[in-house]
Amino acid sequence: MPRETSLVTIIGEDSYKKLRSSRCLLVGAGGIGSELLKDIILMEFGEIHIVDLDTIDLSNLNRQFLFRQKDIKQPKSTTAVKAVQHFNNSKLVPYQGNVMDISTFPLHWFEQFDIIFNALDNLAARRYVNKISQFLSLPLIESGTAGFDGYMQPIIPGKTECFECTKKETPKTFPVCTIRSTPSQPIHCIVWAKNFLFNQLFASETSGNEDDNNQDWGTDDAEEIKRIKQETNELYELQKIIISRDASRIPEILNKLFIQDINKLLAIENLWKTRTKPVPLSDSQINTPTKTAQSASNSVGTIQEQISNFINITQKLMDRYPKEQNHIEFDKDDADTLEFVATAANIRSHIFNIPMKSVFDIKQIAGNIIPAIATTNAIVAGASSLISLRVLNLLKYAPTTKYTDLNMAFTAKASNLSQNRYLSNPKLAPPNKNCPVCSKVCRGVIKLSSDCLNKMKLSDFVVLIREKYSYPQDISLLDASNQRLLFDYDFEDLNDRTLSEINLGNGSIILFSDEEGDTMIRKAIELFLDVDDELPCNTCSLPDVEVPLIKANNSPSKNEEEEKNEKGADVVATTNSHGKDGIVILDDDEGEITIDAEPINGSKKRPVDTEISEAPSNKRTKLVNEPTNSDIVELD
């Protein structure tokens, strides 16, 4: 019986044909992504594109079932595709890259997909994909897990809540989804030091018989087995140094971790196209440590002091190791284990140009790290794949007549809705009318040819937009990426410059606002500039978007007043430029900022709606000096 027989029975022949012709994007091939890839392959999606920036690490293997020890340091996306080939019946296209990289993944690249699955572990990328979904009206299945908690949320642009419709509180825990090959924050280095390095040296079982013929190496290929044994021996070699209690060999650990391994990462050129390269330690730093006194827990010290502390504390733990039956557990209240994690994390931070932290700060962070759970990933991925059939309206017995009839899913603890069952599945809510992403502005995509970008003057561009959407004479135009004022009725300095000369380009987002009306105004529109070299010359195609007249709201609503009193700020600001590496985890501070809504310099113009403005600077930041390419900022 063909594999698809049961699926055809459930969804019908016509829906099965639609499914086979569907093209989906899976962003993330880690914990949830591995499970999702397996699920959507078995569901017979016709074409699946997989994007992931990361490479495989040892810590991934306990829950990311598509990967084996032989795959360590290999790209997740391409390795996952190879791992599923034996049961695959879909066209699979892997990419190793940052989904927020506009040069690799321009907006028109996303247009080919029927649905997007998010399996990400970082907030900036989630927000970015959510905005792409809103600009292109593409359905998005958002998901996430943290330990035993998880959730899944279908997002239908314009019909249901988007990712930004609900506030994202700063998490009190730090989910361990991967151990980064490209750390960008102190937390990444602390996770590496605590969950990988410390466990490998002091808490893992000693090596068994590495030549055991019954050992499952994940392959029958003799060369591959040889390579796996080599990798395994390298890891066990560090532990052998600990077992030997030979303090003179501690510099070998430093050399392996902070010189050899860093050089291996540097050899993977794709990792460093958009980020600063790490700088490994030097032999002289390792071999000439300074003698330092015990430093205070609230001080950081120099990198040389960190190296000396690492050597000293490793020697202490070496002496403890046999006394504790060759197994030491990390405990944040154990001064020795905490000191080891702190020094290792700080050395790694220094190498990756990340600020070092005091032992006191690291104790607070390391004590809150929770592990990822494979079962939670599988449950959330299963719910995501099943709901996609309803999002695409492929179930005849449960047709989707109204998108708010679709369900999201939360674990009981995460949802606070019911403790009587593991999963709660409330129906989707309509968009939050105060959401700055999906409700406060209209959205669209401007298709531009490269020559048009270089020839069209700003004044002509403004006229084109004003006439297309029936805006009055008094308008303002902002570069929403960094809140630069480009044009308004008393600022026309840039009118004779071309779009490229004022640093507008592929991926730029502009905000066009009505500044004239007192009672009724034209709703603001946010436009994404999609520059495509394959478009005909002089192409500047504006989207067919209905921009309605709305009531001017110059005074804060009741909800806004309550929020202001509660939070002490006019608006929760979101960052509009991602970090150089595009890797951000859920412990990012959601900064708050108060924006002065009073007219500036005596102007009688209506102030910019602070909920539309998503960057921590006022709209009247004027570009007066000659523009430079460095001013171009990608969308968060």
Curated annotation (Swiss-Prot):
BP terms from Gene Ontology: protein sumoylation
Pathway: Protein modification; protein sumoylation
Localization per Swiss-Prot or TrEMBL: Nucleus
Polar residues biased stretches: 626-636
Positions annotated as active site in the UniProt record: 177
GO molecular function terms listed in the Swiss-Prot or TrEMBL record: ATP binding; metal ion binding; SUMO activating enzyme activity
Residues annotated as binding Zn(2+): 162, 165, 435, 438
Keywords recorded for this protein, A-Z: ATP-binding, Ligase, Metal-binding, Nucleotide-binding, Nucleus, Ubl conjugation, Ubl conjugation pathway, Zinc
This protein's GO CC annotations: cytoplasm; nucleus; SUMO activating enzyme complex
Keyword Ribonucleoprotein: no
Region ranges (Disordered): 581-636
Annotated ATP binding sites: 28-33, 52, 60-63, 76, 121-126
Chain span(s) of sequence motif Nuclear localization signal: 619-622
A Pfam entry, by short name: UBA_E1_SCCH
Description of post-translational modifications: Multiubiquitinated in vivo.
Family statement drawn from the similarity comment of this UniProt entry: Belongs to the ubiquitin-activating E1 family.
Cross-referenced PANTHER family: SUMO-ACTIVATING ENZYME SUBUNIT 2, UBIQUITIN-ACTIVATING ENZYME E1
Protein name: Ubiquitin-activating enzyme E1-like
Species, as recorded: Saccharomyces cerevisiae (strain ATCC 204508 / S288c) (Baker's yeast)
